[in-house]
A protein has these predicted regions:
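N-terminal glycine-/serine-/threonine-rich beta1-alpha1-beta2 phosphate-ribose binding loop
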Residues: 1-101
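ATP-dependent carboxylate/acyl-activation modules
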Residues: 5, 281-356
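Short, ordered loop/turn segments at secondary-structure junctions
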Residues: 50-52, 86, 110-112, 118, ...
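Rossmann-fold NAD(P)-binding glycine/threonine-rich loop
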Residues: 90-101, 110-148
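A short hydrophobic/small-residue beta-strand
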Residues: 105-106, 384
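Rossmann-like NAD(P)H-binding beta-loop-alpha module
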Residues: 125-206, 213
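Substrate-binding/catalytic subdomain of NAD(P)-dependent oxidoreductase enzymes
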Residues: 183-286, 291-293
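A conserved regulatory-domain signal marking ACT and ACT-like small-molecule sensing domains
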Residues: 319, 324-435
Length: 435
């Protein structure tokens, strides 16, 4: 059988930082293999950067680089546009312009998708071309394509995952080496995992943007970052991690998107990011250091987990490269795989969310205290699953894991506990993956 004739596809790349440079290198290294397997010959024909005098470490002639991103998008010889510049503007306008010209777009920009995803999805559908973004949520982990395609007809109930490598590295160091939060963060910064200002990572904003994208795709719902409840890891202590360990759990920062039913019977979506106690026998408990994983639960498929490197120039570029090949192939075949408009679905307020909880309280160690504490739990419909007492002389620390309870009921329980004379202080309160 003769070899198929290759179709030339000229690519314009917007941005050439770590991911962009790694992508250009991958195209150079793998173009021969791609051509043999798919019949598509990829060529990076233009790269838009802020400063053309900076050495990007890629094998490209100087005339490929330009500071005019609009010219790259509008160039009629450019077939596919790859956006890896980051930020919302001018990335949004450039992506919309490319789509309006009938050019498929590949992006790794989670902030853009989280804030303006539906606008871009509708534009891509109207143009009949691809908008692909596998790299936007979990680096090299292929989760977007399964949600868009393989699981499109699956009645998904929950998608949750470790989608921020920085916080997972910090929590792993605290767990495995007993490092304090401050020391683990400093090490992450020294290794380049954390920015000098780590707020977006450690306070859950980065994971929140990714959770919005995941929820939108998993449930076809209109979800933006403002809909996502988030707590970070800056308040997690080594003592919390050790207490969790004694109760058979580790602590992970999880992004959770789940479909449920409101008290009045309407479908609702809960989307949140927070530190979570994960049982040691759960697959997510084995995801350590800077690795990411996404755990999917569905009515028919059961449970699936996608695992891999969630950050880094080359792993992320690998996902972009895969999208680029798909976009080029669909362009040759004359069709795209648009997402289109999203549905209005009620976003559950955090008070309505049900979860299991871990909490610790310091109490006077005297008769009758435990029964008083248990009465407060019961009075607010919060059922205790397990309890551990650690003696501290005249004081004792009580550690509880509850069964599923409504967040609002848990908050009322905390207020009730705070009113007991025997309760000296309320310590950590963390959610638990539980029944």
């Amino acid at each position: 059988m003769g070899q198929m004739e290759a179709t030339d596809v000229r690519v314009g790349v917007l941005g050439c930082g770590n991911v962009g440079a790694a992508l250009v290198t991958l195209v150079d290294e793998q173009s021969g293999v791609v051509s043999e397997r798919t019949g598509i010959s990829l060529e990076v024909a233009a790269i838009a950067v802020r400063n053309t005098s900076v050495d990007r470490g890629v094998e490209c002639s100087a005339d490929v680089f330009t500071t005019d991103a609009e010219a790259v998008v509008n160039d009629p010889s450019i077939d596919v546009v790859v956006e890896v510049m980051g930020g919302i503007e001018p990335a949004r306008q450039l992506v919309l312009a490319a789509l309006s010209l009938g050019k498929p777009v590949v992006t790794a920009n989670k902030e853009l998708l989280a804030a303006h995803g539906e606008e871009l999805y509708v534009a891509a559908e109207g143009a009949g071309v691809d908008l692909l973004f596998e790299a936007a949520v979990a680096g090299a982990i292929p989760i977007m394509r399964p949600l868009r395609e393989s699981l499109a007809g699956e009645p998904l109930t929950r998608v949750m995952g470790i989608v921020n490598g920085t916080t997972n590295f910090i929590l792993s160091r605290m767990s495995d080496h007993g490092a304090s939060y401050a020391d683990a963060l400093s090490e992450a910064q020294d290794l380049g995992y954390a920015e000098s200002d780590p707020t977006a990572d450690v306070e859950g904003f980065d994971a929140g943007a990714k959770a919005a994208v995941i929820a939108s795709l998993a449930f076809g719902a209109r979800v933006v970052p403002a809909d996502v409840y988030h707590e970070g890891i800056s308040g997690v202590t080594v003592e919390d991690i050790e207490a969790a360990r004694t109760m058979g759990h580790c602590i992970k920062l999880l992004a959770v998107a789940e479909r449920g039913t409101s008290v009045d019977g309407e479908v609702e979506i809960g989307v949140r990011v927070h530190p979570t106690l994960v049982p040691f026998d759960h697959p997510l408990a084995a995801v350590n250091d800077s690795f990411n994983a996404v755990f999917v639960e569905g009515g028919a498929v059961g449970e699936l987990m996608f695992y891999g490197r969630g950050a880094g120039g080359r792993p992320t570029a690998s996902a972009v490269f895969g999208d680029l090949i798909d976009a080029a192939g669909n362009l040759r075949r004359g069709h795209g795989a648009p997402i289109g408009a999203l549905s209005d679905v009620r976003i559950a307020p955090i008070g309505d969310i049900k979860s299991a909880y871990y909490l610790s309280i310091e109490v006077d160690d005297r008769p009758g205290v435990l029964s008083d504490v248990a009465a407060v739990f019961g009075g607010h419909d919060v059922s205790i699953k397990s309890m551990e007492q650690v003696g501290l002389g005249a004081e004792a620390q009580l550690r509880f894991i509850t069964h599923l309870a409504r967040e609002s009921d848990l908050q009322e329980t905390l207020r009730g506990l705070g009113e007991l004379d025997a309760v000296r202080s309320i310590g950590s309160v963390l959610r638990v993956i539980g029944d």
